Amino acid sequence: MAAPRRLIVGMAGAPGASYTVSLLGRLRQLGVESHLVTCGCSRSIIYSETGLGLRQLCSRADGWYHERNQAAAISSGSFLNLGMVIMPCTMRSLAAIVTGVADNLVQRAADVTLKEGRRLVLAMAESSSSRIGQENLRHAEDLGVRILVLPPAGPTLTVAEKNEEILACFGLGDAAARAPAPR
């Protein structure tokens, strides 16, 4: 059975909220249902980067979940979807995902996404020069995770291009034909 056109969008903190706001708008344009989960650290950054309050951000998604709600629909493999993107993703969240630790709903939904063989894209807000960080990135890629690095949010064109790259990972958007096939 084909997955419904729905995508889980996680925000794990760090700079990059403008990318998420733009992605939610683009998903709505494409008629793709979006389910947003935010961590506390990301909520504190949203306003400073975008001028939006949490309610305004959540109104751009079809569903919103609190990070502590591990019983949410998106924490179950029976919640059919195209996959998940965590944007921005921190090195801490990456480490939790590759080790199977699920302390919050962002990490739990990522764990379920991998378990179900769905596409997981981590849009890293930072690159790591530490050996541990590099090993975690390699481990994630070995698990089939697509890793992207977010440049500092700047021109609208840069944000739009990165979002099209993310959408293409799921067979969506203008760049879908140029991306590797979703797994």
What are these regions (language model features)?
Residues 1-121, 125-183:
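A cross-family phosphate/adenosyl-ligand binding-site feature
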